[in-house]
Amino acid sequence: MADVSNSEPAIVSPWLTVIGIGEDGVAGLGDEAKRLIAEAPVVYGGHRHLELAASLITGEAHNWLSPLERSVVEIVARRGSPVVVLASGDPFFFGVGVTLARRIASAEIRTLPAPSSISLAASRLGWALQDATLVSVHGRPLDLVRPHLHPGARVLTLTSDGAGPRDLAELLVSSGFGQSRLTVLEALGGAGERVTTQIAARFMLGLVHPLNVCAIEVAADEGARILPLAAGRDDALFEHDGQITKREVRALTLSALAPRKGELLWDIGGGSGSIGIEWMLADPTMQAITIEVEPERAARIGRNATMFGVPGLTVVEGEAPAALAGLPQPDAIFIGGGGSEDGVMEAAIEALKSGGRLVANAVTTDMEAVLLDHHARLGGSLIRIDIARAGPIGGMTGWKPAMPVTQWSWTKG
């Protein structure tokens, strides 16, 4: 979807009014909202919204088209003429207001929000909203909840439909959080409002209203899969065949990659996908593309991404540099495998954005020679990582060294 266009002449006064409406319908609207709906020649909204406000609508009522972009195009075409859009609760909280604001300047939009379902849920529960974690799985994978499952955490989850609470309970149980308290808050603010609390492992709720929020008070079972917040998570948390950047090296690698909000990483030679996964865990806005030539490993990366709660990780099955063609330009690149192949380093350097970071690791002398050459020509930082782990030697304990890793880090000027 295109962003707000600067080519259109400015319109100072708002012509588009976005009104939040709750389950209490017209009764919950203020006088100004009621007047604007009644006077609007055109009103857009979902079927439920239009039904809730039917007693006020005198103009044309337009149901959202599928895909939504078709309706947005229609609304933009009416620029300068009064249009009202009805939305759930707060239109700028995971709502249609965000979509519209990408195409229409904020000065042209008047917004009259209602309380969001999340705000209503927090008030019903007596939770401090600023201390809770908010996760939307509305039209998105339920696995996005996984990184937030820490004992004692309070998580408010926007679901897609009436099956969401049951599916969430099953995810909690399968991840080792079956003793968590799961509260389902249905049709908040409406006549059919219902609030039910159960233990996830004993979840028995039958028919659930499609408009619901799930509140989780996280409690871990013995052996629960708790994902640490710091980079360099235990290798055992990943499914792998031995091709994995070990946790200590991974922590140093991610430090060198220096993730920043909203950035895109290319992980060339994905192995288990651990670098791309931990990059995405740094912030919900992060993106990563992992390139892996082996089909079995590519499938394994996808499974790891799901289990770590970053199902948005893109896996490209193919061999660099050919597999890099056509990919979106990255802010950072990690080369953990295949860097000594012809053209890989050159293609990565060429693709990287100005100011972007490239980090490459070597465990073979062939790849080390490539890194030494690039360091000599381009500069950057070159370090050697030596890790030794204590282990039994006869009846005593000694140090067992791992293969040394040479790491080259470089920022493109």
Curated annotation (Swiss-Prot):
UniProt cross-references to SUPFAM superfamilies, sorted A to Z: S-adenosyl-L-methionine-dependent methyltransferases, Tetrapyrrole methylase
EC number: 2.1.1.132
Signal peptide: none
Entry keyword set: Cobalamin biosynthesis, Methyltransferase, S-adenosyl-L-methionine, Transferase
Catalytic activity: precorrin-6B + 2 S-adenosyl-L-methionine = precorrin-8X + 2 S-adenosyl-L-homocysteine + CO2 + 3 H(+)
EC class name: transferase
Pathway recorded for this protein: Cofactor biosynthesis; adenosylcobalamin biosynthesis; cob(II)yrinate a,c-diamide from precorrin-2 (aerobic route): step 7/10
Gene from which the chain derives: cobL
Single Gene Ontology MF annotation: precorrin-6Y C5,15-methyltransferase (decarboxylating) activity
Keyword Transferase: yes
Entry-linked InterPro entries: 4pyrrol_Mease, 4pyrrol_Methylase_sf, 4pyrrole_Mease_sub1, 4pyrrole_Mease_sub2, CbiE, Cbl_synth_CobL, Cbl_synth_MTase_CbiT, Cobalamin_biosynth_MTase
Family membership noted in the UniProt record: Belongs to the precorrin methyltransferase family.
GO biological-process terms attached to the record: cobalamin biosynthetic process; methylation
Record-linked PANTHER family: COBALT-PRECORRIN-6B C(15)-METHYLTRANSFERASE (DECARBOXYLATING), COBALT-PRECORRIN-7 C(5)-METHYLTRANSFERASE
Designated name of the protein: Precorrin-6Y C(5,15)-methyltransferase [decarboxylating]
NCBIfam families registered for this protein in UniProt: CbiE, CbiT
